[in-house]
């Protein structure tokens, strides 16, 4: 018997027999994966609703990348988590050969899309903070959309081989979804996935945020010191860094387990089974953590959540009169357009100067008529 067949049978035993016999683990897995599915579906749906409802997503590159990340997380939750949960709760794979291939393809597709998006947004934040004026022509919504198309295109290219990577095998009268490629080909593909889907994006993110933090926390604005614009930059950078760190932490054990299968001595026993289960739970939980981070860090996003909930719970909210501070009317992320904040400050100074030199005008009587939105029209 070849090493390839030995590994497939061992993994078949791990996926089917071991998981089915561990009844307590099956119950725990069902609860944990159900919680991940509910939180991820609701959380990412709210993120998408807030961004799309605000109408500002098309004018801000950071919000576009956050939207792209939420779409990737939402697809992962819907197309991957429910099916992967059955590996630990059922005796075998019950969804057929096609879904065996498609589910693992979507796992890697969305993982690539998330890692590439985080790398792109880290570069975007660095340019916005370090070169707010010079980078304005580059950091346009149109270019951000092009970057998103490139991200999904590259993700399709890198994840495409996984459509043929997995196969169904028969093990103890059960169908089990396991890798079907030869060992050498598996090593090449999984190593490339680790390098291009994890290592390189993490290096880009680390370099970008190291330079961003160094500049943001040490640079001194000679005009106004710690301005509102600079505080907003720090807050949104903090939020994106937290999201990125969570991605790195949650996906690292998943890659380590796969590499240990291929290159290390990783016996199939209860301990390694538990570690594999933990690595999957951490990777899948990452897709439901981002909305929680947005809600905890971003004041404007919390307001966006409340507005979405108020629209869902009560249709009468449309007839209410809200007095809102103009500076807080955008329910998106506090990133806003950091360069716009600087331009607003400059315009304010210019307007003050014009007011001083402008001759006084004769007072005139002015009549203002206000029509409330809930008044009956004639």
Swiss-Prot record:
One Gene Ontology cellular component term attached to this UniProt record is: plasma membrane
**Which keywords does this chain's UniProt record carry?**
Disulfide bond, G-protein coupled receptor, Membrane, Receptor, Transducer, Transmembrane, Transmembrane helix
UniProt topology in membrane: Multi-pass membrane protein
Task: Give the subcellular location.
Answer: Membrane
| Signal peptide range | none
Q: Which residues lie on this side of the membrane: Extracellular?
A: 1-30, 84-101, 165-187, 260-276
Cystine pairs annotated here are: 100-177
Q: Per UniProt, what is one GO molecular function of this protein?
A: G protein-coupled peptide receptor activity
Please name the PROSITE patterns in this protein's record.
G_PROTEIN_RECEP_F1_1 (PS00237), G_PROTEIN_RECEP_F1_2 (PS50262)
**One of the GO biological process terms:** neuropeptide signaling pathway
**What is known about the tissue distribution of this protein?**
Expressed in neurons in the ventral area of the interpeduncular nucleus (IPN) where expression often overlaps with spx1.
| Keyword Transmembrane helix on entry | yes
- Which parts of the sequence lie on the Cytoplasmic side of the lipid bilayer? 52-62, 124-143, 209-238, 298-378
- The record lists the membrane-crossing segments as 31-51, 63-83, 102-123, 144-164, 188-208, 239-259, 277-297
Q: Where is this region: Disordered?
A: 339-362
* Task of the protein: Receptor for the hormone galanin. Receptor for the hormones spexin-1 and spexin-2.
Similarity comment text for this entry: Belongs to the G-protein coupled receptor 1 family.
Name of this chain's protein:
Galanin receptor 2b
């Amino acid at each position: 018997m070849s090493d390839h067949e030995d590994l497939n049978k061992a993994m078949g035993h791990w996926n089917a027999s071991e998981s089915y016999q561990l009844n307590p683990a099956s119950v725990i897995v069902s609860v944990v994966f159900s919680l991940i599915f509910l939180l991820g579906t609701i959380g990412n749906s709210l993120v998408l609703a807030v961004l799309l409802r605000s109408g500002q997503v098309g004018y801000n590159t950071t919000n576009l990348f956050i939207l792209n990340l939420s779409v990737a997380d939402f697809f992962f939750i819907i197309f991957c988590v429910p099916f992967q949960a059955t590996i630990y709760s059922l005796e075998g794979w019950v969804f057929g050969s096609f879904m065996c291939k498609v589910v693992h393809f979507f796992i890697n597709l969305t993982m690539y899309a998330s890692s590439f998006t985080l790398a792109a947004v880290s570069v975007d934040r660095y340019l916005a903070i370090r070169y707010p004026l010079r980078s304005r022509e580059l950091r346009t919504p149109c270019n951000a959309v092009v970057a998103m198309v490139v991200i999904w295109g590259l993700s399709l290219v890198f994840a495409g081989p996984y459509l043929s990577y997995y196969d169904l095998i028969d093990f103890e009268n059960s169908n089990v979804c396991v890798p079907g490629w030869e060992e050498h080909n598996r090593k090449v593909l999984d190593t490339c996935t680790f390098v291009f889907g994890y290592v390189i994006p993490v290096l880009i993110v680390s370099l970008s945020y190291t330079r961003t933090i160094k500049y943001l926390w040490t640079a001194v604005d000679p005009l106004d010191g710690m301005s509102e614009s600079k505080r907003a930059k720090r807050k949104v950078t903090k939020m994106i860094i937290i999201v990125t760190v969570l991605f790195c932490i949650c996906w690292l054990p998943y890659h380590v387990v796969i590499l240990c299968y291929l290159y290390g001595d990783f016996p199939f026993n209860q301990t390694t089974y538990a570690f594999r289960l933990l690595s999957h739970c951490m990777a899948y939980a990452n897709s439901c953590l981002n909305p929680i981070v947005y809600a905890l860090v971003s004041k404007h996003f919390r307001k966006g959540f409340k507005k979405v909930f108020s629209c869902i719970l009560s249709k009468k909210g449309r007839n209410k009169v809200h007095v809102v501070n103009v500076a807080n009317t955008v329910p998106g992320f506090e990133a806003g357009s950091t360069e716009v904040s600087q331009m607003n400050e400059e315009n304010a100074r210019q307007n003050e100067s014009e007011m001083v030199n402008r001759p006084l005008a004769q007072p005139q009587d002015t009549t203002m008529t206000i029509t409330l939105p809930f008044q009956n029209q004639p």
